[in-house]
Each structure stands twice: as C-alpha cells, then as structure tokens.
C-alpha cells in the first residue's frame, strides 16, 4: 500500500496500483477504492460506499469488527447501530422518503421533513434537563419505538434522526 496525505493506492506484487473502484479485498484486508484509478482513502474518516457507511483507517484499511465511539462496524466493514432490527428500520425509513438519484444532503433533508411530520406525543419523563446525551441502549429503544409506531416524544425524534443521519454517513450524536 502506498499512502500520502490521507489517500493512497493498493499496489500488487509488480508495484502497480490495483485499478478499479469499489471495495477491494487484498492480502486479508479490505479497502475502498473511490476512483477508477484505484485511489483509496486513508484518512480515519466516515465515507459512503453505495448505500453503506464505512470507516477508513489511517493505513487505508476499512475498520471491520470494531467501533469508533458509538459507530460500530461489522465484519464486512459496514456501519451498524448495533441492532439488526433498528438497522433495517432505518434503511426502510430512508428508502420510503428518498429516491436513488438524490444527493446525500437531499436525502437528509427529505428524512428530516418526514421525521418532523410524525406524530408528537409530548415529553418523556425518562430524563431530566441534566441529561445531555441519550445513552446508546436507550437511543436504540427510542428509535425503534418511533419507527414502529410512527409517533413519539422529543427523545424518540432525536434518536431516529441521529440514526438516520449516521446511516447517511454524517457524524451525529443524540
């Protein structure tokens, strides 16, 4: 692997860049080639790969079976909130209010408008004003409730939109 300035190339045994775009499994590692010439990210950041969110590490490999903060990545290197059920609910919600031709920001705006239009039930007494961040296990619970019932309180709305934004590749905290 040749790296410079947060990008690089996977090189084969002849020293040539492995060309093509998309995911590349090479020597037991996985890389994301984002250009046809084979360029990879090596920047320690979130990226979109089709409909999936990935995290490229500083060495150019995808983070697999690991986590960065509340961002968990499976064995394939794809983002998961940690619940297959909620992951599917988020994907279905995004698909229900977006179209394939939309940009990432257009998808975020469409999802925001759709979440905002869900029924509001009033304040949940689960937390007081001193709580700044929803604990991750409760985040999943709150998101699941609004995705399955179509209604919720401020915590449900926040949890749902946070997970939607993450699935679209944005850094988001609730």
Give short role names for the model-derived ranges.
Residues 1-88:
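Extracellular adhesion/carbohydrate-binding repeat motifs centered on closely spaced tryptophans
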Residues 9, 31-32, 71, 112, ...:
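Aromatic side chains
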Residues 48, 104-107, 165-167:
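Extracellular/periplasmic catalytic domains that process cell-envelope and extracellular macromolecules
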Residues 156-174:
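Hydrophobic/aromatic-rich core segments of domains that either
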Residues 84-146:
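Secondary-structure boundary elements
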